[in-house]
Structure formats: structure tokens, C-alpha cells
Amino acid sequence: MTVNIRNWQELKKPSNLEIKTGGDGKRKATFVAEPLERGFGLTLGNALRRVLLSSLQGAAITSIKIENVLHEFSSLAGVREDVTDIVLNVKQIALKMEGEGPKRLQLSATGPATVKAGDIMVSGDIKVMNPNHVICHLDEGATLNMELVADTGKGYVPATANRPADAPIGLIPVDSLYSPVRQVAYKVDNARIGQELDYDKLNLTVETDGTVTPEDAVAYAARILQDQLQVFVHFEEAMSDSGLIGMAAPSAASDESDVNQLNRFLLKKVDELELSVRSANCLKNDNIIYIGDLVQKTEAEMLRTPNFGRKSLNEIKEVLSSMGLRLGMDIPGWPPENIEEMAKKLEQELLG
């Protein structure tokens, strides 16, 4: 199979991603990507928006149980809000949870008092992100004892789905909005390259509930799209008989100098590359020793490496490109059994 890599290599891609933050950068930010090929602003903006709103993991309250309350249409003496209003207020509590749920939380208060989300007693792996959110108001002498169940998930789950089959009397299921993203909007403008205006500029504005930063939310969404689309790419298995992606197999009559040069690159250790300390440490922690180890990693695999981000990825891609290499290569017979001996021999040749 012959693959025309120009299909994707010659398309315009954003040179950088500009991030504009307002008063609260941990909750709201605008991402500006340019230049993009005409139509790609709409394509990427719509795809990111849909994934941001529907597919990110978060935490939410799934049910509550209030002392002396049998159902949500009840009322409590000395509590200004009825139970229906309390349920609506509980739905808006923003939680950040480490690990898996469900987790049981307790809330106890005595009036007069304004009961807020910050009054909920939580364990060390749960944090209330909007502690000033009002749940209800208690008059003099009134008491409120409530048990809340929090869980992790994605998207929106209606209250009917949160009611277990063996639900005890008095359990009130709550609609759960797990998504940490509250609003997403995008706008596509014209972008200029030289005298040409036939390019797109994508402006993506993301607002979260504070449990995740806008930067992380967009990164998660992009990663989800990347993983979902990866199944459609089959070039790694069918690029050429040599198994080297983007590199032609040498003919029998061709000179072996190109192959020898390639082997020299593959046998070099990654610590010989002029990489930033962060990138070098990430490779070391992932046990990537030789360039031959590195080039067989895909971009998706590299981004799964702890503390390895897009900036480090671009740095490594640029260094590999200067040697005629790239990520995602398939090197038959790698690593060779005598790799250390071969590497030492290469080093001696270079020194000699």
C-alpha cells in the first residue's frame, strides 16, 4: 500500500495555542487556534464542544435522605424552603472527588442558620468547590440532618436512574450533572497568512465549575477525540514492506549508506538529544533509552506518559524530524539482542 503523507502533512496547522483568561482563570478561558484550513474551525470547534459538554468525568450528588422526611414533596418545620427546593439546591453543589464512589456525606445544622454547601462534612478525598452555595435557611430551634450520596460519572443522569432497586423509604434520588463543564461557545473568524485570508481562526470559550481547569478540560476532550479516531488509522501496519513508516524500503541494488545512517540514529541514546529537562525526565521515567525505543511510540502513547504534555511532544517531534524520523515508526526486530554491544560499537566509530 502506498500512503500519501502529504494528505495531512501539507495542511495548515496552528503554530501555537493562545489562552486568554479573565478574572478567574481556573474557571473560564478562551482558546485561540490559528491558522486552520478553511472549514476546520467549524469542524474542530463543534467536535470539541460536544465532547466537552457530554463526555468528561466528574462528581455529583446522586441521592439524599433527610431525617423525618418521607418524600420530596414534604416540608420541615422551621425550614423556609420545602424539600423540593432543597433538592434543587443540592443539585448545584460542585464536588471534586478523588477515586471511585459512591461516598456518603453528612450534613447537620441547627437554626438559626443559613445552611451552605461548605457545611457538609467531607472526607479528605472530596472537596466542595462552591462552599458558599446556599442549600436552605433554618429558623430558631429548627434542625436539619441529611445524608448525601456522591458518585462519579459523566454527562447527565436523571433522578429516576439514580434510584436503586432496594431503595429504603425516605431516599430521594437527585438529578446528577457530572460534567465539570458548564458552558462552551466557539466562534470562527478569518485568519491571515501573508496576503491570504482564506484560513480559519478558532475561538473556543470554556467555563467550568472549578473542579477542573479550562485547559485540562480542553486537553481531556481533545484526547477523547484522538483515542476515538485512532481506530480509523491503519497506516502503521501497511506503510511499506520495510515496516518503516514514511520511509521507502531500499532496493537490493541501492547503497546501504542510508540504512546505516538510520541505524546510527536508532542506536543513539535519547539522553544524547538536546531535550529540555522535563522531556528528558519523562522519557527516562518511561524507560525509553534509545531513539529506536522512542520512534516506535505513537503520539497517543507519549501523551499518556505522566507529566508529558503537548509542549514536550512538539519538542520531540521536531528533534526527530531533523533526523528524518518520526513517532509511530515500526522497526522490525527491535530491539536487537546485542543492542548494547551495537551501541558501544557505534559510539567507538563516531569517536574514532
Curated annotation (Swiss-Prot):
InterPro entries: DNA-dir_RNA_pol_insert (IPR011262), DNA-dir_RNA_pol_RpoA/D/Rpb3 (IPR011263), DNA-dir_RpoA (IPR011773), RBP11-like (IPR036603), RNAP_asu_C (IPR011260), RNApol_insert_sf (IPR036643). Pfam families: RNA_pol_A_bac, RNA_pol_A_CTD, RNA_pol_L. Its EC number is 2.7.7.6. It is an enzyme of class 2 (transferase). One of its GO terms (molecular function) is DNA binding. One of its GO terms (cellular component) is cytoplasm. Residues 1-236 are annotated as: Alpha N-terminal domain (alpha-NTD). Residues 257-352 are annotated as: Alpha C-terminal domain (alpha-CTD). It catalyses: RNA(n) + a ribonucleoside 5'-triphosphate = RNA(n+1) + diphosphate. Disulfide bonds: none annotated. Gene3D superfamilies: 5' to 3' exonuclease, C-terminal subdomain, DNA-directed RNA polymerase, insert domain, RNA polymerase, RBP11-like subunit. Keywords: DNA-directed RNA polymerase, Nucleotidyltransferase, Transcription, Transferase. DNA-dependent RNA polymerase catalyzes the transcription of DNA into RNA using the four ribonucleoside triphosphates as substrates. Belongs to the RNA polymerase alpha chain family. HAMAP family: RNApol_bact_RpoA. The N-terminal domain is essential for RNAP assembly and basal transcription, whereas the C-terminal domain is involved in interaction with transcriptional regulators and with upstream promoter elements. Homodimer. The RNAP catalytic core consists of 2 alpha, 1 beta, 1 beta' and 1 omega subunit. When a sigma factor is associated with the core the holoenzyme is formed, which can initiate transcription. This is DNA-directed RNA polymerase subunit alpha. It comes from Sphingopyxis alaskensis (strain DSM 13593 / LMG 18877 / RB2256). The gene is rpoA.
